[in-house]
């Protein structure tokens, strides 16, 4: 889903100047950094999509009036995908000051610029949009779904957490193997953030996949529940059949005929339900009547077995018998 969201955000048109500035400030902060080349400050951003690189170059030119260059690094070695390096060299220091990467005294800002941190909700949304375009990812919906942004440092991560809070979204900053990440795991919170940053089509696709996954999970739970019920029913039928056979051996013909008839039905139709056995009886019986007759047959046989000192009907139900049911 990451590529889908970034493609949509790269095509999003933003009208308010403050939002465009906030987005570029976050994109440059999370996607790149400042370098000294030949005694001059160079602003550089490394991005993973051509669409994001084009958006950055266009906004830098339209909002700040500075030209930029782009270099394409092919995949290979440690790089698993193509990377796009956008540089502003000649006007790097001016851009860094304009976007808040440098403070008024020319020192690097470790978090996000004050105008973004203390700005309005639209500035917070723009900052998240820029941060996601720079180093964000969105996993498929599921039990472990997450929206993450890799941060250049803890200060920037905490600033992004604060921006999410201003949008009514709970995000957490985590240090994962020495890398600072801002993470949102709640599905509803992810949906709310996608809405606020303008990824509406991506949200619809994500929610559709989320719904399909939930439906499949529910269907699987119901299927497992049904399977468990069937196994329990099968084992109960096998156990009942074994006990009835033992009862018939213990009693022989020395039992009321209506009880013996119910026992024979149970043996002849081992997998049938009590309701089905009742329908097979002549005359037909209710399932409660069938259950009662079989219960009395077993009780009569167990009483006879105890009097004779022989194993009762329950002794015929072995673990191996149930395991093979």
Curated annotation (Swiss-Prot):
Q: Does the keyword Cell cycle apply?
A: yes
One molecular function GO term is: DNA binding
Gene3D superfamilies cross-referenced by the UniProt entry: Homing endonucleases
Q: Which InterPro entries match?
A: Homing_endonucl, Sporu_reg_WhiA_N_dom, Sporulation_regulator_WhiA, Sporulation_regulator_WhiA_C, WhiA_LAGLIDADG_dom
**Disulphide linkage map:** none
Q: One Pfam family from the UniProt entry?
A: LAGLIDADG_WhiA
Q: Does the keyword Transcription regulation apply?
A: no
Q: One biological-process term from Gene Ontology?
A: regulation of sporulation
Protein keywords: Cell cycle, Cell division, DNA-binding
Q: Which domain of life is it from?
A: Bacteria
Question: From the UniProt annotation, which stretches of this protein bind DNA?
Answer: 273-306
Q: What does this protein do?
A: Involved in cell division and chromosome segregation.
Q: Can you tell me which family this protein belongs to?
A: Belongs to the WhiA family.
Report the protein name in the record: Probable cell division protein WhiA
User: Lineage of the native species?
Assistant: Bacteria, Bacillati, Actinomycetota, Actinomycetes, Frankiales
């Amino acid at each position: 889903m990451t590529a889908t969201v970034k493609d949509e955000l790269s095509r999003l048109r933003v009208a308010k100047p403050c939002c465009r500035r906030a987005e570029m400030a976050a994109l440059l902060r999370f996607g790149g950094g400042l370098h000294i080349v030949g005694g001059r400050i160079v602003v550089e951003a490394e991005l993973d999509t051509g669409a994001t690189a084009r958006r950055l170059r266009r906004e830098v030119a339209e909002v700040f009036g500075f030209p930029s260059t782009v270099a394409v690094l092919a995949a290979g070695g440690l790089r698993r995908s193509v990377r796009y390096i956008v540089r502003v060299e000649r006007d790097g220091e001016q851009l860094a000051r304009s976007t808040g990467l440098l403070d008024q005294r020319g020192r690097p800002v470790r978090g996000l610029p004050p105008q973004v941190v203390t700005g309005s909700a639209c500035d917070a949304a723009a900052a998240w949009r820029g941060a996601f375009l720079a180093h964000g990812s969105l996993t498929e919906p599921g039990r472990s779904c997450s929206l993450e942004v890799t941060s250049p440092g803890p200060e920037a991560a905490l600033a992004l957490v604060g921006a999410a809070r201003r949008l009514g979204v709970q995000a957490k900053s985590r240090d994962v193997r020495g890398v600072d990440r801002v993470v949102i795991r709640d599905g509803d919170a992810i949906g709310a953030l996608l809405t606020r940053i303008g990824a509406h089509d991506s949200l619809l696709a994500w929610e559709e996949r989320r719904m399909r996954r939930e439906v499949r999970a529910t269907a699987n739970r119901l299927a497992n529940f049904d399977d468990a019920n069937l196994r329990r029913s099968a084992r109960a039928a096998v156990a009942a059949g074994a006990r009835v056979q033992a009862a018939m051996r213990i009693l022989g013909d020395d039992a009321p005929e209506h009880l013996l008839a119910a026992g024979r039905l149970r043996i002849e139709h081992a997998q049938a339900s009590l309701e089905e056995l009742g329908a097979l009886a002549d005359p037909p019986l209710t399932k409660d009547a069938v259950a009662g007759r079989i219960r009395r047959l077993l009780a009569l046989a167990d009483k006879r077995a105890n009097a004779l000192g022989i194993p009762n009907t329950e002794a015929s139900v072995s673990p191996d018998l149930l395991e093979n049911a």
